[in-house]
Regions:
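Mature extracytoplasmic domains of secretory-pathway proteins
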Residues: 69-70, 74-87, 91
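Bacterial Sec-dependent N-terminal signal peptides
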Residues: 1-25
Length: 154
């Protein structure tokens, strides 16, 4: 009976971890490396308005996802209030979320607006940042994206 209880605890623990990981991947734009923002520093986006690649020497983990920073100072800033530095829409392309789909981003294509940052897809066919910026009704754009994100992040 004790062995059965041990097995049940193990199965529940592993099952919970797998479900948590799957939910994290669905709501956050990460690959199998589990590194957010393709290694770019979330603090650089918000505090400096720059896309800067971080370093694994300055790594912090928040909710099971690793974030890289350019310095120990940036890492300390992040660790004081990590939620502040989370990208909108889990780091997926903001215009894609507006359109109802999740797309990986080009970490150099971003917009900082009202204390938040939005990341965008950029490829040969689509410059999603340009499409986002061309929209006159930003409030409608964000409302629609917010509504779509509630469905897409589940």
């Amino acid at each position: 009976m004790k062995d059965l209880a041990t097995i049940m605890v193990f199965v529940l623990t592993v099952g919970t971890s797998v479900v948590g990981y799957a939910q994290n991947k669905k709501a956050n734009n990460i690959d199998d490396s589990e590194i957010a923002l393709q290694g770019y520093s979330p603090v650089s986006y918000l505090e400096l308005g720059l896309a800067q690649r971080g370093s694994k020497q300055h790594k912090s983990t928040y909710e099971g996802i690793s974030y890289y920073f350019t310095s120990a100072e940036q890492k300390a800033i992040f660790e004081k209030n990590p939620r502040k530095y989370m990208p909108q829409y889990g780091g997926f392309c903001a215009f894609g979320i507006y359109a109802g789909a999740k797309f990986r981003i080009d970490p150099n294509k971003f917009v900082v607006d009202n204390g938040k940052y939005y990341l965008f897809l950029n490829d040969l066919e689509v410059d999603a940042k340009q499409l986002w910026m061309a929209e006159n009704d930003k409030a409608k754009l964000k409302r629609t994206a917010d509504t779509n994100w509630k469905k897409l992040s589940k």
